[in-house]
Amino acid sequence: MNPSTPSLLYTSIFFYFTIIATQTLSLDPKFKACEPKSCGKGPQISYPFYLSGKQESFCGYPSFELTCDDEEKLPVLGISGEEYVIKNISYLTQSFQVVNSKASHDPCPRPLNNLTLHRTPFFVNPSHINFTILYNCSDHLLEDFRTYPLTCARNTSLLRSFGVFDRKKLGKEKQIASMSCQKLVDVPVLASNESDVMGMTYVEILKRGFVLNWTANSCFRCITSGGRCGTDQQEFVCLCPDGPKLHDTCTNGKNDKRRRVIVKVLIGASAAVVGLIAASIFWYVYHRRKTKSYRNSSALLPRNISSDPSAKSFDIEKAEELLVGVHIFSYEELEEATNNFDPSKELGDGGFGTVYYGKLKDGRSVAVKRLYDNNFKRAEQFRNEVEILTGLRHPNLVALFGCSSKQSRDLLLVYEYVANGTLADHLHGPQANPSSLPWSIRLKIAVETASALKYLHASKIIHRDVKSNNILLDQNFNVKVADFGLSRLFPMDKTHVSTAPQGTPGYVDPDYHLCYQLSNKSDVYSFAVVLMELISSLPAVDITRPRQEINLSNMAVVKIQNHELRDMVDPSLGFDTDTRVRQTVIAVAELAFQCLQSDKDLRPCMSHVQDTLTRIQNNGFGSEMDVVDVNKSGPLVAQSPDSVIVKWDSK
């Protein structure tokens, strides 16, 4: 290769990314000003809310102005003389949970004002009951009222303060109560009936808070067109990277059509430049490896892959280090365990090899992966799985028992055997049985899978092939996440790595597919597809469905935004008959919607996803999610590839 070639490549790359950086720096100031913010904890704040001191007032409406609670690091909303701490925000239901700030900070909270929502865009969600607090009441007031005494107040022998839920009785005696007490304050409490708060104290009841809904212009079309919502003299505008639009999207009108044509031309030209650069780099690297391979020995690898192209890049010293501490099985031992790799013992196959059931001499049941002879990447995949799994210990990750020796005829990996098949088998495969997989079990599977992925990301590992076929289940439906052949160890100081898209159709992150940038948010997107599988029992890709529903992720987004989630929920889950199931399914769907955003920066991290699912599992309510509008518009702009005309294995 000509010595000047690397310099030419670096110069080309420099100019290409200089152009990209220039485009980024030219973003409209209002667009940049309305980037979502938070107070440190709790939900991120964006339209129709805005965070005073951190965002401009044109990022939301005046009635939605929030401040930060310095102690709790949560957003605060002022209504009718009281301050309310916002615990979470849900745009799926256009609602947010609030708690009176006195209940958050004061050991003896005493709200002094009735909640008045007249001339505000807010209204109390029906999921509440009214709690009336009676302050400083004379001792002769009916004893029946004294259900929840305010014991922390300065009661005397003549005056008492307490709360009551019995609105009917209080209604009859309202005049008596108003005459006998100095003040009556009505407080809504999140509960369907009094039995929900049975056994709680006065303070615990107030700390439950309540849910408010709001009305505001839809932001969905603006978000999915790449914009951010805001206001101009209290009128809705879509704030786009190139300037505000008076309509609700960044892609409307003749000028936008012309701009899209220009963008397509620029993208095409950029793609050509990148393609040329990539081809040159590939040729250069290939030439270097080819030259180096003559100097390297392939003795470490099994004899029948010494001519394997991937073997030439398989670092011998690192491979020897890799096998330290890993149990080495002989080929004969595994051949006997699998009855000479009997086809009847096949458990499944993937892009790299076939998995067989085996039984070792010590009685252990194992799963043996035999990598395909004709797959030139098998040595790389072999090393990848060994390198990753030997350093991991988590109850929801499949365990690697060992591998074949360097003198083995084949590359073999030995895993713990997980007896109950895959999640895909139970949802829409040969083991599908609605009665065996109720919603509580599905939610448990979601929590455990998220826990495993959170652990991987904390270990700087991206799975890159999260799907229901790679989620194994034992007899108690405990999760074991498997198949790390595509996984990547992530550099500690990087937010993404550039690599050719790999994965399974229907699960691949569209941002990764479009930009060739792999990040941990790619796993978040794939996991969201699994969440929708758990809700619907439908496969990620099905070419027999209508065109717009072939891809489950696209189908889910459309159904949620059109308030048609019920249409895709598995009827066996009891969505229409069980209130808790309905609440938790909606909360999980909302979380999945957030994770399916085409822009990876709008997705939560896996730690947030796992924490949210745990909260949903424990108390049935939603999460501290970013605000996302799902009211009026079409599907997200990008979606995971769903083409199955040409077989696309996980490679």
Curated annotation (Swiss-Prot):
Reaction(s) this enzyme catalyzes, per UniProt: L-seryl-[protein] + ATP = O-phospho-L-seryl-[protein] + ADP + H(+); L-threonyl-[protein] + ATP = O-phospho-L-threonyl-[protein] + ADP + H(+)
Positions bearing Phosphoserine: S498
Stretches in topological domain Cytoplasmic: 286-651
GO cellular component: plasma membrane
EC number: 2.7.11.1
Residues of the active site: D465 (proton acceptor)
Annotated positions binding ATP: L347, G348, D349, G350, G351, F352, G353, T354, V355, K369
Record field: transmembrane: 265-285
Stated role: Probable receptor-like serine/threonine-protein kinase involved in abscisic acid (ABA) signaling. Acts as a positive regulator of abiotic stress response.
Record-given protein name: LEAF RUST 10 DISEASE-RESISTANCE LOCUS RECEPTOR-LIKE PROTEIN KINASE-like 1.2
Gene: LRK10L-1.2
